[in-house]
Swiss-Prot record:
It comes from Pinus koraiensis. GO terms for molecular function: rRNA binding; structural constituent of ribosome. It is found in: Plastid, Chloroplast. Belongs to the universal ribosomal protein uS12 family. This is Small ribosomal subunit protein uS12c. Residues 9-40 are annotated as: Disordered.
Length: 117
């Protein structure tokens, strides 16, 4: 326990909570432009995205197959990918240049698919 004199000399510092998605700067989503990431793996689809806030982040492309190329404009939301270290963002499908997932029947809202007629 510190003495009162020690507390007067230097007060207790409040603990700062660190954000899990700092590049979004407190916004729910942000827009960005894609640059392809190095391995362009067939196993996991990720993209380097330059945000309007100036950050360069790695974002995961959910769902089967995608139409994204270099200079595509995408919307990015928070949410990490467990087995990919350093990937803390998801690209929102069905908005801007990211097309919805084809022939999706269940969990459609997560992949930007409209209700089938």
């Amino acid at each position: 326990m510190p003495t009162i004199q020690q507390l007067i000399r230097n007060a207790r510092q409040p603990i700062e909570n660190r954000k899990k998605s700092p590049a979004l700067r407190g916004c729910p989503q942000r827009r960005g432009t894609i640059t392809p990431k190095k391995p362009n793996s067939a196993l996991r689809k990720v993209a380097r995205v330059r945000l309007t806030s100036g950050f360069e982040i790695t974002a995961y492309i959910p769902g089967i197959d995608h139409n994204l190329q270099e200079h595509s404009v995408v919307l990015v939301r928070g949410g990490r990918v467990k087995d990919l270290p350093g990937v803390r963002y998801h690209i929102v499908r069905g908005t801007l240049d990211a097309a919805e997932v084809k022939d999706r029947q269940q969990g459609r809202s997560k992949y930007g698919v409209k209700k089938p007629k």
